[in-house]
Amino acid sequence: MGLQVKDESKRVLQFFLRYPMKPGQRNTIKLDIIDLSTASNQYSRQYLADIDRYAICQSQATMFSHKLVALMDRYERFGSIAGRDIYDIHYFFVNGFSYDSKVLSERTGLKASVYLEKLLTFIEKKVNMRNIDEDLNVLLPPEKFKAIRQSLKTEVLILLKDETNRLRGV
């Protein structure tokens, strides 16, 4: 396959692998190896077109659930906030993906409605423009970054409020 390790994390099992491709085309894949397994995780076999291979991957619902937990988990474990966690939450909600409340409950020990309200409060109090700017300005194309940076936090809060209201039957 000709994969080369372009970069890797010193703290977690994360690799950026470069593969041969024509100039101007995507040539890097991010590989996260998560050694945290929950009984509620769902997996399926997926075709990864960029590398012409199949892999066993988390379902979208499982992945979204872990993304919802990642923001506060990262803060509790490392004292840091990653703008990409906010962006990922936004992406999953806006694209109409569902999360798995069983995974949320297993990871947090809370009912989904309680956890999402806690997450909403956390984002309101802790996430600021600096968190978003420092992380996303290097991950997104400039036009996309400019378009989303001012509204990202507000939109995520609205999406979470809508979801907590839905869960409460409001």
Q: Could you describe each region identified by the protein language model?
A:
Residues M1-V170:
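Structured mid-to-C-terminal alpha-helical surface segments
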